A protein has these predicted regions:
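Walker B beta-strand of ABC/ABC-like P-loop ATPase nucleotide-binding domains
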Residues: 142
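Active-site-proximal or metal-binding-adjacent scaffold patches in catalytic folds
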Residues: 1-139, 149-201
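Walker B catalytic acidic pair
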Residues: 145
Length: 201
């Protein structure tokens, strides 16, 4: 499932945009609660369980420093990957059993160009960034990819399969997902630029 291919004209510098995005970064959905807090010590710490992340940043953390931004984005990616690996495959397996569908394997990837994909071999890839989305949209992407197990296209039979699994809400959910893609496009563009070629040590 491809995301909207938006190339926005940024009205502020990449560093300024990242500073604002990171200061206000929070996830509060039925699947995940992710909070950034500022502590009183000079060290970062993380409290993590499945469905919950609390990242305590060092006192005086400088959101405008490019190196700090890169570090924080990479930490966010690492934590989202952990959550996605523990939450998304079990949901996919549950839906597959419910609708009597058979897939091969599920992979969680750091991809922002699309939310998910299904190969002709029955392998399903899901973006770790799905953890940002509301539960109903996350489930929609999972069901969308499961529908491709029977229909490897986006024709009428495919949408009939999606509607079968979404109580005839396939097109409406697709529109909502496209709107969510628009809302996250600039953030993804900036985060990708800042972290390109870097990994956590």
């Amino acid at each position: 499932m491809e995301r909207n291919n938006l190339r926005p004209h940024l009205v502020m510098s990449m560093t300024d945009y990242a500073a604002q995005a990171l200061k206000h970064f929070e996830i509060n959905t039925e699947l995940l609660r992710f909070r950034l807090l500022t502590g009183t010590s000079g060290h970062a710490s993380i409290k993590r369980s499945v469905g919950s992340v609390e990242l305590m940043l060092p006192y005086g953390f400088n959101f405008s420093d490019p190196d700090r931004q890169r570090w924080l984005i990479l930490i966010i990616i690492r934590e989202l990957r952990f959550q996605a690996c523990h939450i998304l495959p079990p949901r996919l397996d549950e839906f597959a059993r419910q609708y009597n569908l058979r897939h091969q394997r599920t992979c969680i990837k750091n991809i922002t160009s699309r939310w998910g994909s299904c190969s002709s071999l029955g392998n399903i890839n899901l973006s770790l960034w799905l953890m940002l989305a509301p539960k109903e949209l996350t489930d929609y992407v999972i069901l969308h990819e499961l529908a491709h197990l029977n229909e490897m296209n986006h024709g009428p039979h495919f949408w009939a399969e999606v509607d079968r699994m979404t109580h005839n809400q396939g097109r409406a959910l697709e529109r909502e997902m496209k709107q969510f893609s628009l809302q996250t496009a600039v953030m993804f563009k900036v985060f990708n630029q800042i972290t390109r070629g870097f990994q956590l040590k």
